[in-house]
Amino acid sequence: MGTRIRSGIFGLAGLTAALLAASAAHAAGEATEAHAVPFVAVAKTAVPDRDWPRKVCELASASCGVPGQPGDADNAPSLYRARNDASGIYYAILPGPQLLKVSFASTAGWKVVQQWNFSDYQPADRVDGDGEPPPLRIYPALYPLGGERFAVAVLAGWSESYSGGGGSWENADFVELRPNGGHARTPRVAKLPFSCDKQIRACFTEHDYQHSPHCSEDFDGSLRLRFVPGASAGHLDWIATWKENHWPGQEPRSKTGHTSVSVTLPAGRDPVAAGNALRDKIPFCEPVN
């Protein structure tokens, strides 16, 4: 599969995943329902220090790439803010992966408020794809566990490529952040489907290309989460909803099918079993016979 097609597939996967935090943060529910805290990327014009990537990466002892440079995308740091945080407070996601809460003042420069390093984290039974797997990454959002406890989504991705198409997938381990800068060894949920995107060629003859309304079979899916009071005080149950679209090959867009599956993930459930509770019910961007 060519570079152009691969880039398009990964771009779409990123877009569908980005919908997750926005949907979770604004999901309708009761007044008592907790919400995810999405991070908002800081625009270049709003960054208080243009040299922040080098300085913040040095503070974290991280080997960072240069934002916007070809080949450095997997190692480039990203800077975010969370809604309602005090002025001068930021979150940085660095290779490793690492999550930093940092502060900036014109007189003092950058300081690390908290640092969570996931370079020692290994997701269980990671899926193999084509070629080298991409590095683990942290999705820019915080997910409530109950009380003042939050988790982050550590994403393990893989891809497939072949003539005329390809696909990319991501599973998420939701791992609790410790107040002292550590992280839980056991995730709240393991291998929960997070996003997927797949394209299969559907045209093979000149007649197909000239007359077909759609020359590929397209799939895309993404996760939404809701958080509700659980049976145990101080703990939240999660409601995971998977939404997937399937546009069949050689059919008009009006024939696109839509799937929505929801499962409840009670607090304290075996992490792998929790992930499988959703995975076993969805196509995950694969054709269903």
Placement of each model-derived feature along the sequence:
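N-terminal secretory signal peptides that target proteins for export/translocation
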Residues: 1-7
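Bacterial N-terminal signal peptides
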Residues: 11-21
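Acidic, small-residue rich beta-repeat scaffolds with periodic aromatic anchors
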Residues: 27-69, 165-171, 177-289
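Basic/polar, acidic-poor N-terminal "presequence/leader" segments
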Residues: 47-102
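Signature of short aromatic-glycine-proline-rich micro-motifs recurring in repeat-based ectodomains
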Residues: 72-79, 128-142, 209-228
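Short N-terminal edge-element motif at the start of the domain
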Residues: 79, 88-148, 160
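Short beta-strand elements that form the blades of beta-propeller/WD-repeat-like
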Residues: 87-94, 149-161, 234-241
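Eukaryote-skewed repeat-based solenoidal scaffolds used as protein-protein interaction platforms
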Residues: 137-148, 153-173, 188-196
